[in-house]
Amino acid sequence: MRVDVGGGVRLFVDVDGAGWIPEGQSMRQRPTLLMLHGGPAMDSSLFRGSGLDELTDVAQVVVYDHRGAGRSDWRSPQEWTLDTWADDVVRLCDVLGIVKPIVLGSSFGGMVAQRYLARHPGHPDRVVLAGTSARLDLDLVAACFAARGGDRAGAVAQQYLAGDQSLAADYDELCLPLYAIEPVEAERFARVIANPDLDAHFTKEWNAMDLRSGLAQVTCPVLVIGGELDPICPLEAVRDVANALPPGLVRIIELQGASHLEAAADDIAPFVRDFILESSQSQS
């Protein structure tokens, strides 16, 4: 379904699992897990079949496509900013009546979640930041691509991520396969409704952003997950995120032998499930 979040902007939303379940003579409300997809030019179909689908046994799962992506309204590039996407989380929750969501931000979605935490620190119950970074360290990322895919992959990554769109095809050929340990079935990406203009537009903000200062004011528990072999969000960058968060609220999990897709979605469901079950909402 498409939901109007204000200003005539419609976001595509999909809901799995019951929000209320019978418990004796009454009904108990379950936590809501709101999942923010990566890309940014991808869509929420990337979560399907990742294992995160199975979390409906502990929460109502809500996925949506960001403004500018997938089945949501694409709108004007002037609206494709982290501030807008972060505020869309709150707008969507207001419309759907979601209070104190558990927010999972994957890859680019984790950048949105970090900005959301900075702008709306009291809004979530808890947050998962999976396979994401607070800033783009081009030299580090290029070195990681080179280590896994050779010097050419490293050079292409450095130039493409800096904004050279003429290397998009080379990046897709040499670098994207390194996002996973095992080959990814072609159908997974074929299902995505891609907006390549969104990637090109966000590259400017990505190269300039540094989200670390906004994480200092976080007031809820945060689970940070990274992959040992992730070239686009290396473990050093994941640790950078964790170190920017208040020590008493952050927990970090480093997945050995995992690349980006594994750390951002495919292998994280057991850790997310435990994190949900720790929520006061699950215990009420």
Regions found by a protein language model. Name each.
Residues 158-213, 220, 240:
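Alpha/beta-hydrolase
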Residues 248-284:
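Catalytic active-site module of serine/aspartate enzymes centered on a nucleophile-bearing elbow/loop
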Residues 218, 224-226:
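Short beta-strand/loop motif that positions the catalytic acidic residue
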Residues 231-237:
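Conserved alpha/beta-hydrolase "acid-adjacent" motif
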